[in-house]
């Protein structure tokens, strides 16, 4: 791998790259210079598992770290270009940045404004908010296969579902094309400001969290409307099970919004994941709803200290 132009690091700790600030090291950590550099890296070691990491906003890295190569796209993958109502964004572009740029150009991608993460991650998990999903605006994506081959992914290829897509394992999205409805920039800006105010009022935005911990049992996102009477929301069933504010070590289900798992200071990945599993158990016992993790959990457990 001597011809790579990006940055390659062995045994790179990952905790400082995740919002929850937990987790062990990755065997390899690579930040490619561009798509050609990324393709060369992928071809160089076909047997090694790879994991694509965005900004670490929806992620628990377990305490034992990751026996894989972690790829993090950076400056060479965050450009944004707008042509009419079509928006072409690098996979590393932040969702919020794309929403703002699109709004300024009169394109409505406002649902992305409050979603923490990158556009590549938004495609992989069909991110959505306020009743709109990536699937609703997705046109196509450029990607590299695990073998380093450039491909184009269509909506049919990805088979979007609630918080899921059929992105092939090892595939790295590099660029995404979206198309949103037209709108007046001032109105779009006002809508995003309203969304941000609602988030600030209802979510623990100043705490160390990974965003929504569990998917809504109903299988769709909240619309955010006052008249949305749908009851099968993750936060509601967690509340019904009496788990708002529950703690395990330094891990806590937020008292402000019980579907947010919080590192109150010094929590381990094991504590966070264990509390999440306890919540799932209590919710099923109390309500009959099976919660499914929305936060991605990767890596090996840490060693248990001797008694």
From Swiss-Prot:
The active site is at residues 163, 212, 294. The gene is murB. This is UDP-N-acetylenolpyruvoylglucosamine reductase. Its EC number is 1.3.1.98. HAMAP family: MurB (MF_00037). It comes from Dinoroseobacter shibae (strain DSM 16493 / NCIMB 14021 / DFL 12). It catalyses: UDP-N-acetyl-alpha-D-muramate + NADP(+) = UDP-N-acetyl-3-O-(1-carboxyvinyl)-alpha-D-glucosamine + NADPH + H(+). Residues 21-183 form the FAD-binding PCMH-type domain. Belongs to the MurB family. Its main location: cytoplasm.
């Amino acid at each position: 791998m001597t011809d790579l132009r990006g940055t390659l690091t062995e045994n790179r700790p990952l905790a400082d790259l995740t919002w929850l600030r937990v987790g062990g090291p990755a065997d390899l950590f690579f930040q490619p210079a561009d798509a050609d550099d990324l393709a060369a890296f992928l071809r160089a070691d076909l047997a090694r598992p790879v994991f694509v990491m965005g900004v670490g906003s929806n992620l628990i890295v377990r305490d034992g770290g990751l026996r894989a190569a972690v790829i993090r796209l950076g400056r060479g993958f965050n450009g944004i270009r707008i042509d009419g109502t079509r928006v072409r964004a690098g996979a590393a572009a932040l969702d919020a940045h794309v929403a703002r740029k699109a709004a300024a150009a009169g394109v409505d991608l406002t649902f992305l404004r409050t979603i923490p993460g990158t556009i590549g991650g938004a495609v992989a998990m069909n991110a959505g908010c306020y009743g709109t999903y990536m699937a609703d605006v997705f046109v196509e994506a450029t990607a590299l296969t695990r073998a380093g081959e450039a491909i184009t992914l269509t909506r049919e290829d990805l088979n979007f579902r609630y918080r899921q897509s059929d992105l092939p394992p090892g595939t790295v999205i590099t660029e995404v094309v979206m198309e949103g409805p037209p709108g007046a920039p001032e109105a779009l800006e006002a809508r995003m400001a309203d969304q941000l105010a609602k988030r600030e009022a209802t979510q623990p935005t100043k705490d160390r969290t990974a965003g929504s911990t569990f998917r809504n049992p109903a299988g769709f996102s909240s619309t955010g409307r006052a008249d949305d009477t749908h009851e099968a929301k993750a936060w509601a069933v967690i509340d019904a099970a009496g788990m708002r504010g529950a703690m395990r070590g330094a891990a806590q289900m937020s008292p402000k919004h019980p579907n947010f798992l919080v590192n109150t200071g010094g929590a381990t990945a094991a504590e966070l994941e264990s509390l999440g599993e306890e919540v799932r158990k209590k919710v099923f016992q109390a309500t009959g709803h099976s919660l499914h993790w929305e936060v991605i959990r990767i890596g090996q457990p840490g060693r248990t200290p001797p008694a």
